[in-house]
Design a protein with these regions (language model features):
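Catalytic core of pol beta-like nucleotidyltransferases
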Residues: 1-52, 60-200
Length: 200
């Protein structure tokens, strides 16, 4: 797509993504703790299509933020959901989706590009179109967490907020499904993430 030039990320795209990541880090007070910013998922591999999201990962050692890794993970996830909910950022027609990843956890993906170092950490291969398990789980977990968030709002009797969030989420799930079908394969990241959500 329009993101790559001679196997490296387009400079304008890179600058914009770095600005987004830095703004998120500043607003969530994790500035100075971000070890790397990576671009991953289908747009960083050969599984992309017109409805693919831009998966922007901020790598942080959760132990640097607090002792309880699970609580920090939940907090980072909540901050990420709130950010994605209130910022509808598009680049070249693709929505930017932020993730905060524990830098001590291994992340397996078909393609991972470091924005900080401007180089491939995992270079995708056109011949090896394998299932990107981490991308599938990340996508499904992201939606599942948002479903939980809607439930929480409803239980707290924030009905208007829950309704607004549910409508937005419904559109997101529809997009996920149609994106998977458009990608043409039953093995697309979006289609498998949709099935994972549906069956859980």
């Amino acid at each position: 797509p329009d993101f790559w030039q001679n196997d490296t990320l387009n400079d304008k795209v890179k600058v914009k993504l770095m600005e987004i990541a830095e703004e998120f880090a500043k607003e969530t007070e994790i500035e100075g703790k971000v070890e790397d910013i990576t671009f991953t998922g289908s747009l960083a591999s050969y599984n992309y299509h017109s409805k693919s999201d831009i998966d922007l990962h901020l790598l942080v050692d959760f132990k640097e933020i607090g002792k309880n890794g699970e609580i920090i993970k939940d907090l980072m996830n909540l901050l990420r959901i709130r950010w994605n909910e209130t910022h509808n950022i598009m680049i070249n027609g693709h929505e930017v989706e932020i993730y905060v990843q524990d830098s001590t956890e291994k992340h397996y993906s078909a393609g991972v590009y470091s924005l900080s170092d401007d180089k491939w950490l995992v270079k995708p291969s056109p011949e090896a179109k394998t299932l990107d398990y981490d991308a599938i789980v990340d996508k499904a977990t992201s939606i599942s967490d948002e479903i939980d968030d809607v439930r929480t709002q409803y239980r707290q009797k924030n009905y208007e907020k829950a309704n607004e969030m549910a409508k937005k989420l419904s559109e997101k799930i529809k997009k996920l499904r149609s994106a998977g079908l458009e990608a043409g394969g039953i093995y697309s990241i979006e289609n498998l993430a949709f099935k994972l959500i549906r069956n859980s």
